[in-house]
Amino acid sequence: MARWGTIYSRAVSVPVYEQRNQPEGVPPLALTGERTLPDIPEENYWFRRHLVVYEWIAARVQDLRVLDLACGEGYGSDVLARTAASVVGVDANPEAYEHARLRYRRENLRFERGLVATFSAPADAVVFLQTIEHLADPGAALEHARSLVGEGGVVFVSTPNVGTLAPKGASRSDNPWHVHEYHEAEFEQLCAAHFATVSMYGLFHARKLRAHDQALRLGWDALHPRLRLTGRFYEWFTPAIATSDFLLRAGGDAPLRRALDFLAVCRP
């Protein structure tokens, strides 16, 4: 993980960090860059950036049967289970599955090990976050998700905005796990090819992250190395980031080309 001078970049090639302070009997997961994890202070920016979308969705799936496809560590499935009638978290990775199964326990929550493309169970809502950029055939995955909810259901799909994720002047990020990264129009068109209605949202910085962005524009990233403040500042700042430091906005209310991530709310 890169320090925050290049604040929002990630070093994804070496699993340097591991989850800390896990409950007894729960094996910690190593951070590889393929998925975000809680309980790693250096990863907190990315964890909160993903968590806030789960919290937003949880407020909209009350009393529904929910599938969380490619659920990873399981934290998002746990958030959804606070409001949903039932949640099934699905992931193909054996370590992630075992960790999630042991760590997150609710009567209305269970985890299954399986492939996104083949897992089948009736649902009112499918949650499919930060995964489509990893797939060689995203259309097939969306079609499968649509078939799981049927008429009257809803599918939530998110992906990074390559326009803000990639380094300046580059056509994509350096994340080796990503097969294809999307601009707004391309992502919306992909979803619209499989759903009758698609409502687009964008995730943006808020509160102290907006203030940090402004500081960068004023030259903070050039100044703090000279003052030898980089390490000390970000050792405090990064763990202090909260979900309230992000904001989801509807496409009609904000220029989504500047969003961090896109969220498509799709209905058959």
For the regions a language model picked out, list residue spans one by one.
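Conserved N-terminal segment of class I S-adenosyl-L-methionine
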Residues: 2-121, 125-129, 139-142, 177, ...
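Class I S-adenosylmethionine-dependent transferase superfamily signal
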Residues: 80, 145, 191
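Short catalytic micro-motifs in class I SAM-dependent methyltransferases
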Residues: 130-134
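A structural helix-start
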Residues: 135-139, 159
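Short, glycine-/aromatic-enriched active-site segment of Class I SAM-dependent methyltransferases
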Residues: 157-180
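Short alpha-helix
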Residues: 179-194
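Substrate-binding/catalytic lobe of Class I Rossmann-like enzymes that use SAM or dcSAM, i.e.
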Residues: 190-215
